[in-house]
C-alpha cells in the first residue's frame, strides 16, 4: 500500500498527501548542541563525514530530536573528489581547500572515472543503515554537487567571491572546461545511482554556484550537465524523485524547469506563488522559508510557514528552508520550524 511509504516520498512522487512533508537543508549541523559536542571530539570534517559510524550518528541527530519527514546523508558535495584523484580538505571557518587546483588539460585527462563502491563504501553503508533505522517514518535522501559547482571548487581551489578563475577558463578555454564538466556529469550520475541502490529514496543535486552565471552562460556551462546527470540517473532509476537546488536562482528559474528534474528547490528570494507561476504544473517545489527567519520568534516562523504553504497549495510541495539552516540559529527555533510545519494544516485548513 502506498500509504505505508514515507510521507516525503509520496509527496515527491506527486501523490496527494495530508500535509506537505518537512525537512531542512543542513538539518544536521552546528546549530545543534549534540553536533557541536561530537565535533569537539572529532574535529576533522572529513572524519565526521567519512567514518560511517560518525556520519550515521550525525545524520540521525535531527531525526531523534525533531522527527523530520526526511533524513539526509551527512556528507559533503566534495566527498566524491578523491575517488576521481582530487584531494581536498575542509578547514573550519575557511571551507573547502583543494590541494592541487585543476587548471590544465593534462590534469583533466588524468582524472579517474568514479567507482563509488570502491572509493566511498562508507556512503553506501550509512544510507543502508539509515533506511533500516527510520523505516517508513521518514524518507532517506541522498545528494550530490552538480558539475558546474564541483568544477568551480576544483578550478578555483577554494570558495570564491567572484569566480574569476573558472570564468577565465570558461571564456578563454571553454573546451577544457567542457571536458571537466562532462567528466563530472558522468561520475556524479554514477554516484547518484550508487546512493539510490544503497538506500536513498529521494535525491537532490546542489548547483550552489550556478546562480553566479548569466542566463546564457547557465545554458552553456550548467544546464546541459545538470540535464546529463538527470538523464543518466533516470535511465536506470526513473521512479526516484530528483530535486535541483541553486542558490540565487531567480534569473534562471524557468531554465531549471527544463533540466528534467521533478522538483525545484526555491531559495527565499523568490516568492513562492511567483515561483510556481514560472514553472510548469508537473514540476513540484521545495522550500522556501528564509533561514534568517529562524533567528526570529516562533510566531514569525509559524506565520511565514503558513504563508508559504498557502501559496504552494494545490502543487507538489516539500516544506524546507530556502538555503541551509545558518550556524548560530537557536536550536529551539529549529524545533519550532518542524513543529509549525507538521501542524500547518491545522491552522490554514485542508485543501
UniProtKB/Swiss-Prot annotation:
Disulfide bonds: none annotated. Its main location: cytoplasm. One of its GO terms (biological process) is protoporphyrinogen IX biosynthetic process. This is Uroporphyrinogen decarboxylase. Homodimer. GO terms for cellular component: cytoplasm. It comes from Synechococcus sp. (strain CC9311). Keywords: Cytoplasm, Decarboxylase, Lyase, Porphyrin biosynthesis. InterPro entries: UROD/MetE-like_sf (IPR038071), Uroporphyrinogen_deCO2ase_HemE (IPR006361), Uroporphyrinogen_deCOase (IPR000257). The record marks 76 as: Transition state stabilizer. Pfam families: URO-D (PF01208). Catalyzes the decarboxylation of four acetate groups of uroporphyrinogen-III to yield coproporphyrinogen-III. Substrate binds at residues 26-30, 76, 153, 208, 323. Pathway: Porphyrin-containing compound metabolism; protoporphyrin-IX biosynthesis; coproporphyrinogen-III from 5-aminolevulinate: step 4/4. It catalyses: uroporphyrinogen III + 4 H(+) = coproporphyrinogen III + 4 CO2.
